[in-house]
């Protein structure tokens, strides 16, 4: 997760689907993997449940058909494999990310060019307001068109990062550490500094501690 640190060290990388509540629409940030295999005791070890997409939605009395909007941090396959199930959703993606998805470079195998063929895609070009209280922040580097998602909550702003990171990328003192996986290191560095310097609760996209939270805030 961290550039030039802990290379070769095995870590678990949780994959999250975030549900945004409070408005009149059912909104997701990312849709995760469709199929995955994890050790039986992993959730117990870290204090959270590991659920498949439909099962997780059902915990909130939702089905894929109930989803109105999906906001994508980026389009690596582990963030968008369940999109096609959400037949009524508009899918918000950065223009540069969509362009790369359609013509990916061989160096990055995590893009499936046809993965959004059956969904209603809305292109976003840079920072934008998606809904009242929900904005996207253009944060490229980990991917060409990554976007972090800023949400106004009852306890202030929360930001879901648009790039691969965990808590170790955000030390309490000093600059943030660039994501260890990136297509453009300098863009990745600048993006993570921008997010760290914002007055917000930062939710690192692959941090294990988030899985034990029932809601934020």
Report each predicted region and the residues it spans:
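Conserved beta-strand hairpin/beta-sheet module of binuclear metal-dependent hydrolase folds
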Residues: 1-55, 148-163
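Residue-level detector of structured alpha->beta connecting loops
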Residues: 24, 87-90, 199
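Metallo-beta-lactamase
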Residues: 34-37, 48-51, 55-62, 66-78, 93-138, 144-215, ...
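Short, solvent-exposed loop/turn segments at secondary-structure boundaries
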Residues: 40-43, 105, 214-216
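Short, conserved loop/helix-junction motifs that constitute active-site signature segments
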Residues: 84-87, 116
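Short hydrophobic/aromatic-enriched beta-strand-loop microsegments
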Residues: 90-95, 160-162
């Amino acid at each position: 997760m961290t550039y030039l640190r802990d290379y070769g060290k095995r870590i678990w990388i949780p994959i999250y689907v975030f549900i945004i509540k409070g408005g009149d629409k059912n909104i997701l940030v990312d849709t995760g993997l469709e199929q995955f295999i994890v050790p039986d005791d992993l959730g117990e070890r870290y204090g959270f449940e590991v659920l498949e997409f439909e099962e997780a939605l059902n915990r909130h009395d939702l089905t894929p058909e109930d989803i109105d909007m999906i906001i994508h941090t980026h389009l690596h396959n582990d963030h968008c494999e369940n999109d096609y199930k959400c037949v009524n959703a508009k899918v918000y993606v950065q223009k540069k990310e969509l362009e790369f998805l359609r013509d990916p470079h061989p160096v990055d195998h995590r893009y499936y060019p046809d993965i959004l063929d059956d969904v209603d895609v809305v292109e976003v070009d840079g920072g934008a307001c998606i809904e009242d209280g929900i904005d996207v922040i253009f944060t490229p580097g980990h991917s060409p068109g990554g976007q972090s998602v800023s949400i106004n909550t009852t306890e202030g702003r929360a930001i879901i990062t648009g790039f691969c990171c965990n808590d170790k990328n955000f030390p309490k003192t000093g600059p943030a550490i660039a994501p260890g996986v990136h297509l453009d290191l300098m863009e990745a560095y600048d993006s993570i500094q921008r997010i760290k310097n914002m007055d917000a609760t930062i939710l690192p996209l692959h941090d294990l501690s988030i899985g034990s939270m029932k809601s934020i805030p």
